[in-house]
Amino acid sequence: MLLQFTPASAASETPALLHGHLVDIGGGRHMNIVCLGRGSPTAVFEYGLGGNLLNWQKVAGPIAELTTACFYDRAGYGDSDPSSRAMTAGNVTHDLYWLLKKAGVQTPFVLVGHSLGGLYATLYANRFPSQVAGLVLIDPAFAGQDLDETPEEKARAASIYAQSQANIARCAALAREAKLSSNNPAGCVSLPANATEGERTYLAQQFAKSARWDAMLSESENLHAAGALSEDELEEQRAARSFGDKPVIVLTASIIPTQPGETPEEHAKSVGHWKAGHDRLAARSSRGESIVVPNATHMIQLDQPLAVIDAVRRVLLAVRAHRRR
């Protein structure tokens, strides 16, 4: 299943979520993080490919009422400085380690990852197990997600991927020339009709940054590989370990669109493979759950935010109960 970049979305005024804090992570680089609420364990959120902080706007407030909730921008995204290194899962998790350490985020925390962010969250839990108390994975990417494809399916996926990469590269070039704005979207800038003025300003600024498009291009290159495991997948597979008895909830979208040229049989097989991958992630914990969320597309946190809020709440309660033993 080919993961495309996350569309922009907006539904309510969320000023607190957009008021971040730049943290020096070393090497002359700063990364943006915003933490809301109070309580323990902290919940740390990782958005998907091409995402932004507004991807969490429907869940940020309610979860901040339950505990401390921290949201951040990866290198090149939002207000975070770009990295000179490739945006591999290993490098992304390395950055997150130092950001959370320098920001003083208390460990262990609950890691919440969406889409590609789910693969990053999984690898982080593999690499730094003592820092992660539990996981909520929202329609996550996973190692081997494309290995069920026939030669015909691989060819279609390769064509879609090539078109996507070409468009991202085109948008990056336009951004470098300062030619992207809400007045000149050029097929790159998408501002929701229901966005507030503050959200529209924020999104327009994000789309206008060439570093964002460069980061997306690098992330996509390291996520997808025709007929083989990608660099990100290899990194996760090499580091894979049991999650023991840590609470893990994996949420799967119930609305999965058919790809161009895909037959009903191919689509059914792809959906089954996607769910099976999520089941395997949940099975790495003795307290893992794999749940299909009704009436939800890939953007579960926007379509069915209560499902995400409830999953985080349940993992938080499980972690707190374990501490009281």
Outline where the language-model segments fall:
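Alpha/beta-hydrolase
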Residues: P151-R280
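Catalytic active-site module of serine/aspartate enzymes centered on a nucleophile-bearing elbow/loop
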Residues: R284-R325
